[in-house]
Amino acid sequence: MTLQIIAGKAGTGKTTHLMDEVGEKIKKTSKTYIFIVPDQMTFQMETSFLNKQNLAGMLGTQIFSFSRLAWKILQETGGLSKTFLSQTGIEMVIRKAALDQKDKLKIFSRATSKKGFYSELAKLFKEMKQEEISVDELEKSAANLSTSVSSKVHDISLIYQKYEELLAGKFLENEDYLRLLADKIIESDYLNQTEIIIDGFTSFSKQELTVIEKLMQKCDKVTVSLTLNVPEIHKGLEDFSMFKASTEAYFALLEMAKLNKIQVEPEKILLENKRANSDSLAFLANAWGDNKYSSYEGGANDLTIHQANNRRAEMEGVAREIRQLALNGYRYRDIAILTRNIGDYDILCETVMESFDIPIFIDKKRAMAKHPFIEFIRSSIDAILFNWKYEPIFQAVKTEFFFDVAENATIMRRKADILENYVLENGIQNKWKWEKEGDWIYRKIRGLSTNVLPQTDEELATQSVINEMRNLIVEPLSTLENNITKAKTGIEFAMALYHYLEQVKAVEHLESWRQVAEENGYLELAREHEQAWSSISELLDEFVEVLGEEELDVNSFSEIITTGLDALEFSLLPPSLDQVVLADMENAKLLNMKVIFAIGMNDGVMPLRQKDKGILSDQDRDSLRVENSNLKPSAKNNIGEEDLLAYKIMSLPSDKLFLSYPAADEEGKVLSESNYLRKIKGQFKNLNESVYLTDPSLLNDKEQSSYIRSKQATLGLLTSQLQMYKRGYPLSNVWWDAYNSYFEDSKESEAAKQVLSSLYYENKTKPLQETTAKNLFGENIHASVSRMEKFFSCEFQHFAQYGLKLEERAHYKLQAVDMGEIFHGAMEWISAELKRTNRDWGNLTEEECRQMAKLAMTFLAPKIQHEILLSSKRMEYIQYKLLQIITRATTVLNEQAKSSAFRPIGLEVDFGLKGDIPPLKIPLQSDSELLLQGRIDRIDAAEQDDRTFLRIIDYKSSSHDLALTEVYYGLALQMLTYLDIVVTNAQKMIGKTAEPAGVLYFHMHNQYVQAEKELSDEAIARELQKSSKMKGLILSDPVAVSLMDTNLEKGKSSNIIPAEIKQNGELSARSRTATKAEFDKMRRFVRQKYQEAGNKILDGAVSINPYKLKEKTPCQFCGFRSFCGFDPSLASNQYRHLTNEKTETILTKMDIEGGTQ
């Protein structure tokens, strides 16, 4: 029994030497030669053996990792009777242990609910087993340390002991196999007459060293290769040496041999770099291996450093280099891309390499958490825990496992959308509402539902869909909840979940998806669907094995299962024979690589700016290591490991090394280059440095040609180059050749035309054809005033809402429009009640005003937005605040009525074909008509001296005034339209003609009075009355004004209307008035605006043409903005800038444009 150490720096041929030596020995002896390599290296080592002529097909060689050797020996000697626990199972058991000990924990009681806590604990427990650290040793190390450290160790010990208790006698984890292997090696016949060759390790855990010690005692010979700087062996250990770990291993092996009286053969030291095929790469590897600063004066064509604008530009630059290497004869399998942060590059790399038609293998396991099946299970459990709230329910619905497998998925998705809309609109947020007996009733009601009509056929059809989908969810989810609620033990919980998955036919869903993916050539996706079910089956099996007899509650079950789900990962297929590999620098074990791309070489990444993370902080570790040196050192002591990682990269390729870094991240944050790159630049005087450009136009023709990739991917870049050409920049012939190539192939030309058409893209709409317009809007247009205002705001907004009939999704929340409905409804109810009891607004007492307001709110509250005002304490408070506003408004109207001769003659008066007043008919082109319909809040009338006056009052929940500029541009037509309608129909309404008295806005709000000194009650009342003054436009007639405010005195301003009387009895300039002639001009003009709008609608006007008046624009609150794509930065998208003009100018324009009709 002997030990031999093969030592040398990276690239000196240690692995090749060992393989050649075994190749020679195997010809002369019947011994078995076993190679032990790291897990990540086994596949490549097997491939190397197959490709090695003197070893190919040799039966006397075997390749194992430590864990695979353990399986082999334990199969032979016994020891596999216990159940193996996966990483998922380990984390579930740790969570169970932590939950059991939660009340005893001093530090980690809150952390038990945090995601990631259990994976960190699993890492620590793994370290303790690998380094053979017992709980007693850890507690002893912490005995004299600070309270925070000793409390952490106390918690770790409690959880670890419970964890071991749960595993005891029944289960094994990976680290337990090495312990069993060490015990069973002596009994193995398989290891008789064998030589062990250990290669590819930079260090060994204490557990691995124990296994090696047992192998030394059993096997004929143990050979270990170590990457060392040989002079350091004899100088002794340096704290920050990159070879510290391997030097420690070297001395540990010699010490073990000495203790076990194992003969040590002379060590073989390899000094010559046999890997690097160029002087520059050989110099780089040697310089870094010696850790000495020296400079290289020669050419360095095989070593380059590249900067890129961002990670995408970097990845595309790498892809272009790989394409060129392939053209020069390199195989893809000769090339590897290494990165420190594979999570920053994996998806990007896959996308970019696909666009360049480069086969890529990404050496990273992907979490299973986002797979629909995993999400379905998690969301279903959350739905039960959180009383069937909307979010988890519909997260589960959208995975499609509730759907009938036999139904068309597209139809089922549409039905699910209908259900979701209903749930959101009706505020269905708990189990009681979901399981309530009877069908859900669907009515398309907006605002107040004071007059509910019978359901239409369309509503009944929608209701049927809603209840169909509701039942698909409620039945299985209720069964799951009932079973989980009854469950007491782990096995009962697992059975409840398994039966639920059976009930929704999860296997059939996954199998159906797998078949579809396979038929469409998505083989990896097909494998994922297959793995998802097998992983869940294994997870439940492990759960039952470990916790089947344990008593649990619903919360504990949820937490443990969620931990298991979080730990699930998709397994990796080994790479094909010819693929580029993307791998993580730290874990990659690569052999025979000719070209290496080291990407993301930024400061803080290489070397890594260590963060204090994990269960034990750096300070904790430093303190504990004083007593227990087996514990891994703190991150701040890992400088040597960072240098070793960089050295591994520098010495890995035989032919070429490309180093690159992005200058900014995705958000534009500046990133600087690694210090390692600065060091290399200082060493190499003739180093090739360049930039991976996003825009190739600055390069020569040959360099630009490297940007040409697959036809599909090149289209985007070609488009951007042609865009630059359009702006006057020169265009290389490379791009004209690419352009022509698309139109030589009829299959490609259509796609090319579609993409290249973006060069001439303008975000403009074309007018609808006449027949289309009439199909959408009708021969005669039935419209409201607000609709016409919307048309003048933006034609496309009108088209989207009234032509395409698009609607924003309704949510169960009280919005401004709902409050407006309540205010209108309250005023209507109070007025109707006064009329019914033959009372007048001006005769009410203050107490009667309060009572009226309260009764109105009591009547209206259940009738707004599916009883939203009755749904919660918060809504109860909002109802109280709304009542205050209604009460205040009632009081103000009462006060105003006492000082006014005007009285309401109509409230919520409908005009239209079925209204109290006929529609306003506007003649349009081609014998069509525009029929205006709507509802007028309030019509007031007053009489004096055989003159009758009519005015319009509109209740508003926010402050409004009549701006003639907005009237002129068609943005505020409502009030003057209503006035026109009532004056025109006065004979029908009141049996006589009438004059327009004005239009006024009544602001419904709860006013506050601000004063610098204390005010009397009378003064406060006066101030409140002033703040309630109505805004708008009134007739400049002393009679009309005096009827509106009977208390208005000379030299005073009205507290009711926008009028002020001068001392001479005339209206002041501060009054908002218009003459009857001016009102008539405005009425004619408004009709003309409707005619203009109606004709344009019939002409198919759908332009994206929002206005801008000062800072006001319809886009601010438009729900269709993402749909129309309006972008003011485009020349084709500009606002219609409207200007404010003087009243006289506006009236003159109205007179000219309004005609004489």
Swiss-Prot record:
GO terms for molecular function: 4 iron, 4 sulfur cluster binding; 5'-3' exonuclease activity; ATP binding; double-stranded DNA binding; helicase activity; metal ion binding. Pfam families: ADDB_N (PF21445), PDDEXK_1 (PF12705), UvrD_C (PF13361). InterPro entries: ADDB_N, DNA_helicase_suAddB, DNA_helicase_UvrD-like_C, P-loop_NTPase, PDDEXK_AddAB-type. Residues 1-277 form the UvrD-like helicase ATP-binding domain. ATP binds at residues 8-15. Its EC number is 3.1.-.-. Despite having conserved helicase domains, this subunit does not have helicase activity. This is ATP-dependent helicase/deoxyribonuclease subunit B. It comes from Listeria innocua serovar 6a (strain ATCC BAA-680 / CLIP 11262).
